[in-house]
């Protein structure tokens, strides 16, 4: 279920403040954040934000197409290694 429209989009106040500070200084650097639930605002376009995936920080370069999405959508938390099946050795032969 999506957030109520009367509340408006959520963004971490500290993260938005750091982005605006970088915009004023006309500076680009990687910002680390644990706030996966923050909505991407137009002020963030052009910045690289390292989003925590539970294990490490994944660098995400923000583009115009990402505005309105959540930061966590671009840093997957699970690694899919494929379904079980027949084992294949390094030379491509079945065991």
Curated annotation (Swiss-Prot):
Organism: Roseiflexus castenholzii (strain DSM 13941 / HLO8)
Gene Ontology biological process terms, A to Z: ribosomal small subunit assembly; translation
Its job: Protein S19 forms a complex with S13 that binds strongly to the 16S ribosomal RNA.
Assigned GO CC terms: cytoplasm; small ribosomal subunit
Keywords assigned: Ribonucleoprotein, Ribosomal protein, RNA-binding, rRNA-binding
Protein origin, superkingdom: Bacteria
HAMAP family according to UniProt: Ribosomal_uS19 (MF_00531)
Recorded family membership: Belongs to the universal ribosomal protein uS19 family.
GO MF: rRNA binding; structural constituent of ribosome
Coiled-coil parts of chain: none
InterPro entries (alphabetical): Ribosomal_uS19, Ribosomal_uS19_bac-type, Ribosomal_uS19_CS, Ribosomal_uS19_SF
Protein name (record): Small ribosomal subunit protein uS19
């Amino acid at each position: 279920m999506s957030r109520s429209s009367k509340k408006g989009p959520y963004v971490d106040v500290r993260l938005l403040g750091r982005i605006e500070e970088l915009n004023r200084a006309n500076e680009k650097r990687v910002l680390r954040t644990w706030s996966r639930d923050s909505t991407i605002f137009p002020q963030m376009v052009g910045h690289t934000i390292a989003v925590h995936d539970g294990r490490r920080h994944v660098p995400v370069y923000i583009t115009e197409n990402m505005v309105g999405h959540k930061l966590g959508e671009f840093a997957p938390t699970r690694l899919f290694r494929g379904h079980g099946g027949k084992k294949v050795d390094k030379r491509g032969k079945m065991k």
